[in-house]
Amino acid sequence: IWPRDWSSDVCSSDLIFSLFVERSSGISFLIGACMSSAGCVIGMKSATYANVRTTNKARESLSIGETVKVALCGGSISGLGVQAFGMLGFIGVLLIWNGISPDATGHGLLANLECNPSIMRITTYSLGCSIVAMFNRVAGGNYTKAADISADILAKIRHDMPEDDSRVRNVIADFIGDNVNDIAGNCSDLLESFVATMAASVMIAVTIYNGAPSIGEGTLNATVIFP
């Protein structure tokens, strides 16, 4: 799912969280990174197949409505997949460690920094999604811009060859960069925002419960489940 340099960065961050923050937070961080990466991979593959099917539908039917329908169905795969993977990882983190414990305390394997394990697991899960979004934006943006500029320069040198001519090899690289930046980058950004919103609501619910325990755990669970 990740290139080699991404894997080393993610694994080192995972180890740091487990050693110095909270012993199980590294696992939740890795779950978040895997969920975000899986959503990006499915989004890119579905977009690639949808491009071919949309073009073929337009050639066969010559109907704008039928062509747009195929394009929207292909785009909905990544949109629904982002929400599905975000919820899957979030619910998985809650189920693996038996939900939310507002009054629990924990620490890392080496450091004695006390924290709430439930909150820290949710936070690091969101951070795992965010770090993949950053990698996709940076790598996809650089790749896209390099291919785009090189294709523009070649089109200016060769006046008989337009920028998007299939004979220009940089066009394929430009399309790949657009796929990574526009599909994987947007998918990971959306998933990161979606998960961060849920994590923030959980932290607010735990803070309210710790400030006023009289509201009961039923209200806490309802507040956590609502988002």
Language model feature labels by segment:
Residues 19-27, 95-120, 203-225:
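Helix-coil boundary and interhelical linker segments in multi-pass alpha-helical membrane proteins
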Residues 17-21, 40, 90-94:
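Structural signal for membrane-spanning alpha-helices in multi-pass inner-membrane proteins
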Residues 163-227:
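Helix-loop-helix junctions within the multi-pass membrane cores of secondary transporters/permeases
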Residues 41-65, 97-107, 136-170:
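Juxtamembrane helix-loop transition segments at the membrane interface in multi-pass membrane proteins
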